Structures are given as C-alpha cells and as structure tokens.
C-alpha cells in the first residue's frame, strides 16, 4: 500500500477481506494442514471479538492463528510505514505486553518475548536518550525494562522505574 493518507471506510473494509482471499488461495493446498489454513484466515482475529474478517472470539480462534497474530502485530509495529515510524523491537515488545490482555494470546506473546528479547547480562544497549548502557539485571516480569549501568557515568538506572527511557537497540550482545 502506497497511499500516504488514511483509508476511507470502504477502502478499509476491502483491506479487511484479504484474509478471506488468502484463505481461498491456500484452501486446496494439500501440503498445508487445516490449522495452517485457519492461521491464514484468522490472523487478524482478536480474543475479544474485535478482529476481522469473522469477528470471532478466543475460543473459536485456532492456536496457530493466535501465534501468527502475535507475529503479525510485532512485524507491523517494527516496520516502517508511510503514516508512522517503526518502533524499536524493545518498545514493540513492551507495548504488546501492556496491551495484549483481551486481544492477543498471553501465551503467544510470552513465547515471542522469551525468544526474541535476546537480552543477556553484560549486553551493551543504546537507550532512547542516546546514552550507551550495560545490562546489569533482567527482571522476568518486564524483560524489555532491565536495570542498566550508564557507561559514561556508571550510574545504575532501572528502566522499569524510569519509564520515559527505553532500549532503542542492541549494540553488542
């Protein structure tokens, strides 16, 4: 999509049909199991029924679809768009952890976080304020908000307390 302006309601309704068109394309492929085909159809569904194209709730959304939905949201947040800048992976993970309840599978979000965050004690990161820091401690409940030591000053900073600063990128793992 190359339209820099907001979609009209009619255009958005057309966009919301892409899972149906995609499902029809893969429906007769014998190499794909039923769950994989449903993931194509349901990857924009949300647990609270607010998704599309069917508006079904959690109990009717296939587990594969819930996994793909989490990956799709993460990809959308970390990709550059005409209408907004991409977010850092850490910022995206933090947002997903905060806003997942009722929308996304908490298990799928946790799996993404655990496999993607890749932070280790001793890693060097660039913070949103431009400072470089070393990861000192990673809390299990907020892995995207560790305690870091500012390299220039030696000051310890808890990103779970200092909420206006976040990890922009990994510099050295």
Where would I find each of the regions flagged by the language model?
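Histidine- and acidic-residue-rich, metal-dependent catalytic cores
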Residues: 1-173
